[in-house]
């Protein structure tokens, strides 16, 4: 069995890491490269950078952050946010990113997923899905884009299956209801998607304690857990989380590996 992964998430705006609750109320959380180095030293398995500004000016800043990070850490990292072309993918991969995350651009142009997978390999293409539980009594989740501001009307499960067919090698699944709340991952959402696709699913949105991370793996069937507030606020370290999961008999790469 492949080892389960812990992945710190760095939301970047104007060259700084920021964090909010339910996609709003952003606050400064530090320098992205410094945090990347810290998490790498602590034993993170991978990193994710998401450019939430995604403007033309911000892109140059992001490319520089990617270059500096690639020079400073040896663990794989994914970059996403406003990437809408093969040229954009190429630029960030050349700067040192290992994977590219597509979100709104995949909904607008699904062919970008298949073109990216064809040119760079499925292992390079991650599709990020921001899902929000429907208010009606009917079950299911809607896919949102544009930083969680626009409901596409797409069903999250159907969309997850579609992007895998198109060539996505991984899904970054964020529960908008749980994002930044530290009240636990949406286990039903995570399990539903994880059991329905044949690629790894990264659980995102809501980790607040050790038990939450364990449950994402044990009950949500996630392949990886994305962590933000829990680490940025230094409530827990990656080593503490990994030691806890190892005691729970999960297959995790030790921090002293």
Curated annotation (Swiss-Prot):
Heterodimer of HisH and HisF. InterPro entries: Aldolase_TIM, His_biosynth, HisF, IGPS_HisA/HisF, RibuloseP-bd_barrel. It is found in: Cytoplasm. GO terms for cellular component: cytoplasm. The active site is at 11, 130. GO terms for biological process: L-histidine biosynthetic process. SUPFAM superfamilies: Ribulose-phoshate binding barrel (SSF51366). IGPS catalyzes the conversion of PRFAR and glutamine to IGP, AICAR and glutamate. The HisF subunit catalyzes the cyclization activity that produces IGP and AICAR from PRFAR using the ammonia provided by the HisH subunit. Its main location: cytoplasm. The keyword Amino-acid biosynthesis applies. Belongs to the HisA/HisF family. It catalyses: 5-[(5-phospho-1-deoxy-D-ribulos-1-ylimino)methylamino]-1-(5-phospho-beta-D-ribosyl)imidazole-4-carboxamide + L-glutamine = D-erythro-1-(imidazol-4-yl)glycerol 3-phosphate + 5-amino-1-(5-phospho-beta-D-ribosyl)imidazole-4-carboxamide + L-glutamate + H(+). PANTHER family: IMIDAZOLE GLYCEROL PHOSPHATE SYNTHASE HISHF, IMIDAZOLE GLYCEROL PHOSPHATE SYNTHASE SUBUNIT HISF/H IGP SYNTHASE SUBUNIT HISF/H. Its EC number is 4.3.2.10. This is Imidazole glycerol phosphate synthase subunit HisF. One of its GO terms (molecular function) is imidazoleglycerol-phosphate synthase activity. Coiled coil: none annotated. Pfam families: His_biosynth (PF00977).
